[in-house]
């Protein structure tokens, strides 16, 4: 049995995430795309953190106290999207049934997940820049 180069790359990069048996190569490519969101958000934060400003009257302890629940929420959402395997084809939820029918809908799903993770990671990093 001969594996093509694409199959070898996909096998090497098989990351947990959303997968569809209807179009595995597209699904794997989008899954890889979604997994680049944390790197992109962290890079943006590193290059722009000096221009970001928080309210000067906030104490670091108060900021930690307020932001801890949000941090837990963001981390749990990121975990659900990046570190768990979900097969879209086998799901019986109506939304997923609609999404898995067309590649365009799958693209919008992955794109929404990407930007959700990107924004949440950036928002997660901003308050902690002075702490």
From Swiss-Prot:
One of its GO terms (cellular component) is plasma membrane. The chain crosses the membrane at residues 66-84, 104-124. Keywords: Bacteriocin immunity, Cell membrane, Membrane, Plasmid, Transmembrane, Transmembrane helix. Its main location: membrane. It is found in: Cell membrane. Coiled coil: none annotated. It comes from the Bacteria. It holds the Pfam family Colicin_im. It is a multi-pass membrane protein. GO terms for molecular function: toxic substance binding. GO terms for biological process: bacteriocin immunity. This is Colicin-N immunity protein.
